[in-house]
């Protein structure tokens, strides 16, 4: 789902009807008319595991090693991504776990690299998957207990010529 603001789908479903669960939605600043550097998706952290309630599973190394890939298709293209970071980050600039989500959406290479490094630094586990600022990212974001904290799962698009089998071996060595 996409809209001009990031609040509507917090309490409306995909059909636009009021719903306490909301919907998973694309950041309002990201358009689908061109290929964005980053798909930034938000959803509620439901205790039932619905919406993005299951993102916490990626912080479990056994879960991640079993299937480190995410499929994300748009109406324009199919996408396969490999997870490189999962953990809790902060939107508070003074925090040591701060991630600049605006930089992830930017074309500024230095800012993107800093944001990628912050995601990797806040990850629950270290990972051997390399990530370049030119890579297309998929970042799934949900809330946690503290208002300024967010649970994230960050993945990069699998590059042309890369094999999922080789990437999975890298994952098994590191997590």
Protein language model annotation of sequence segments:
Residues 1-175:
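Solvent-exposed, non-transmembrane regions of membrane-associated and secreted proteins
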């Amino acid at each position: 789902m996409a809209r001009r603001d990031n609040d509507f789908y917090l309490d409306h479903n995909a059909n636009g009807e009021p719903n306490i669960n909301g919907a998973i939605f694309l950041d309002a600043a990201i358009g689908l008319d061109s290929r964005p550097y980053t798909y930034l998706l938000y959803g509620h952290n439901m205790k039932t595991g619905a919406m993005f309630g299951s993102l916490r599973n990626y912080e479990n190394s056994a879960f991640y090693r079993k299937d480190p890939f995410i499929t994300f298709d748009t109406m324009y293209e199919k996408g396969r991504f490999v997870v490189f970071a999962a953990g809790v980050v902060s939107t508070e600039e003074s925090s040591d776990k701060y991630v600049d989500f605006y930089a992830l959406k930017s074309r500024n290479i230095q800012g993107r690299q800093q944001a990628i490094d912050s995601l990797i630094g806040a990850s629950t586990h270290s990972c051997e998957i390399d990530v370049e600022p030119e890579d297309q990212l998929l970042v799934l974001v949900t809330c946690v207990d503290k208002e300024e904290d967010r649970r994230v799962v960050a993945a990069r698009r699998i590059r042309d010529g890369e094999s999922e089998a080789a990437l999975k071996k890298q994952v098994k060595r590191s997590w």
